[in-house]
Amino acid sequence: MGTYGSFFIPCLRLERDKMAQIYVSGLTFCYEGSYENIFENVSFCIDTDWKLGLIGRNGKGKTTFLNLLLGKYEYQGSIRTTEHFEYFPFPVEKEMMKNFTIDVIEKIYPDYELWKICCELDLLQTDAEILYRSYETLSHGERTKVMLAVLFSKDHVFLLIDEPTNHLDRATREIVEKYLKRKKGFILVSHDRTLLDQCIDHVLVLERNQIRVSQGNFSS
């Protein structure tokens, strides 16, 4: 049960929408001016209720792949899904930093539903009063919790979560780990092997210019 001001908000378990698929077919990409393909004729299908870890050596295309999903680069082949991709962490404009956190959220996500965000914050062991503090006064951990709460309050989205536990203290890392463990519908990039082992059920492995999908966590 979460609270907002002096009112109680019943935080029922929020179920994600019915499973859909993401189809990647014949994906080929190289940066302009380069003769080496980062990805070459990559094809796979994943379900949108999977909890995927994206694994590969540094500089081998993890960020590039996320940007391709977000539509930031032109590529050959196709990426098809009925879902919309959202990225963590989302950028906050410098001029918005002094505003209340709720105003920052409204700028980024005008159609937000306050009760959903409050419920997600409750799962992250964070009081909703944080929404009425200046965003610039929030710690890195508090900002991480707010961003996750906003993203997981959205419908019809598949989340691309990039290094959510960077710069967090141990207690906050454990809260985020516990939170993500009960969620689904995301690709997680992290150097934290414990986080990957606890929170994912499938793996996207970058090998040379291919992407291989396997069931299991990081260690398996």
PLM feature spans:
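ABC ATP-binding cassette signature C-motif
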Residues: 8, 12-219
